[in-house]
Regions:
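N-terminal small/polar loop signature for handling phosphorylated ligands or for N-terminal nucleophile
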Residues: 1-60, 154-186
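Gly/Ser/Thr-enriched, mixed-charge loops and adjacent short helices
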Residues: 61-185
Length: 186
């Protein structure tokens, strides 16, 4: 996501997987978590990782693991993975940043995600109503800006107004007290 150093951390995580001979698909830039969940199934992956602190304050970052069904890792698999991580000898891992081993998945997944979202969502609004419906959208400086406008356009919504002050992804969330849309301060 747009948190500080997420792109750098993504490359480090990729290096660890390369060391263990695990194929890596990677977005070259931030994407919203639901797009990762979609990509797991679409690409027939076993697991995926999102580097995010969700709606926590800007000084945080995190590491969330998603299983092949697109959902977050849950017990007992989470504890099993933690045991494997704790047993690692980190000095053996070579961080060589081999870009040739990364398979970037940007546009193909973006398009498939938007198409699937429109096909599977309840966009039963008649075309004329879509053209007359005014939508105001904010990503609260987050990654959803990478997907939502395209999904709405693909669904036929033409009058989408993006809040310009909060359009650019920014891990400091400069115009909001909280990046959590569930909180009134947001």
């Amino acid at each position: 996501d747009c948190r500080h150093n997420s792109n750098t951390l993504a490359k480090v995580v990729a290096d660890v997987f390369f060391f263990f001979c695990i194929h890596v698909y990677l977005f070259s830039d931030m994407r919203p978590t639901p797009e990762l969940s979609f990509a797991l199934n679409y690409l027939n992956c076993h697991a995926g990782i999102v580097l995010t602190a969700s709606h926590n304050p800007p000084e945080y970052n995190g590491y969330k693991v998603y299983w092949q069904d697109g959902g977050q890792l849950v017990p007992p698999q989470d504890k099993e993975i933690i045991q494997v991580i704790e047993a690692l000898n980190y000095s053996e891992i070579k961080f060589e940043a081999n870009e040739n081993l990364i398979e970037y998945i940007d546009v193909a997944i973006d398009e498939a995600f938007a198409k699937s979202t429109v096909e599977n969502a309840s966009f039963n609004t008649p075309t004329a109503a879509k053209e007359n419906l005014k939508i105001v959208y904010t990503s609260l400086h987050g990654t959803s800006i990478k997907a939502i406008p395209g999904v709405l356009a693909k669904a036929g919504y033409t009058d989408v107004n993006i809040v310009p002050e909060q359009e650019v992804p920014n891990g400091d969330f400069p115009t909001v007290k909280s990046p959590n849309p569930e909180e009134p301060e947001a």
